[in-house]
């Protein structure tokens, strides 16, 4: 047992002298490992008598426990000291300004769509939606565009093999609303539409908003006032010049194209307005009686107006964008301007 006491004292001294955790582990292996000096004493217990063996084993285990506790305490102290040193060397200066986060923002097309919806919701209109994959009846026939009608040439349509198609405008939503309800109707139908066209001012997919109001006694004067007020709200120009030019659409009669005074040059004439001082903005007209009848509305009792516009077109003019394709390229340098 005297040898045990000497080994324990030597082990405790080396634990205190260990300069790092690796040296401390070397001490553990030297005295407590499988071939360690204190562990070797356990092998000598077999030479003792049965009466002496339990007492001797207890003494050896007590010595081993002292060394283990010393190693654990020393290791804990080393780790705490290392942590304090690390924290001291990595001190954060809380007075420095934060990095912050880059905030997101609405896409300019969504921003414009919400602005359009907000205006018409204030006027008591509802927002209606419909399928993007349409049938020929709702996209053409019900809108007074039969199969032989030359107006179909104005729509570069994507067809499926079963005769269905990708809608070329959101007007089919108006027909479906009339089919499913009873007048009066006050709705706008925003959504994606598809046409086989692609250049600086056209893409195969774009967004439209079409509006419909059907009630008793509706006249072109109601249409004119609604559209003019909407355009002044959209471009935030109180005295924005607005003019209506006679035009043709198979689903309205009479029909008109709506122009606004160029918001870039104030009507002086520039590249944006082709030096005319006016910019074509949307189409509109009084709903054709044939369309009302196709929707199950009595054209003798009710009348209404409809209008339609491309959201990207409005956004291009509102935000001064000269290439429609910029809206779809997802270039953050472009989109961040609208955040």
From Swiss-Prot:
Q: How does it associate, per the subunit comment?
A: Tetramer of two alpha and two beta subunits.
The entry's protein name is: Phenylalanine--tRNA ligase alpha subunit
Its gene name is pheS
Any one GO CC term of the record = cytoplasm
Q: Which NCBIfam families match?
A: pheS
Question: Which family does the record claim for this protein?
Answer: Belongs to the class-II aminoacyl-tRNA synthetase family. Phe-tRNA synthetase alpha subunit type 1 subfamily.
Q: Where in the cell is it found?
A: Cytoplasm
List the source organism.
Answer: Alcanivorax borkumensis (strain ATCC 700651 / DSM 11573 / NCIMB 13689 / SK2)
Q: Which Pfam families match?
A: Phe_tRNA-synt_N, tRNA-synt_2d
Keyword set, alphabetical order? Aminoacyl-tRNA synthetase, ATP-binding, Cytoplasm, Ligase, Magnesium, Metal-binding, Nucleotide-binding, Protein biosynthesis
* SUPFAM superfamilies tied to this protein: Class II aaRS and biotin synthetases, tRNA-binding arm
Swiss-Prot/TrEMBL GO biological process terms: phenylalanyl-tRNA aminoacylation
Q: Which InterPro entries match?
A: aa-tRNA-synth_II, aa-tRNA-synth_II/BPL/LPL, Phe-tRNA-synth_IIc_asu, Phe-tRNA_ligase_II_N, Phe_tRNA_ligase_alpha1_bac, Phenylalanyl-tRNA_Synthase, tRNA-bd_arm
The UniProt record lists the keyword Iron-sulfur = no
Note describing how the cofactor binds: Binds 2 magnesium ions per tetramer.
First-level EC class: ligase
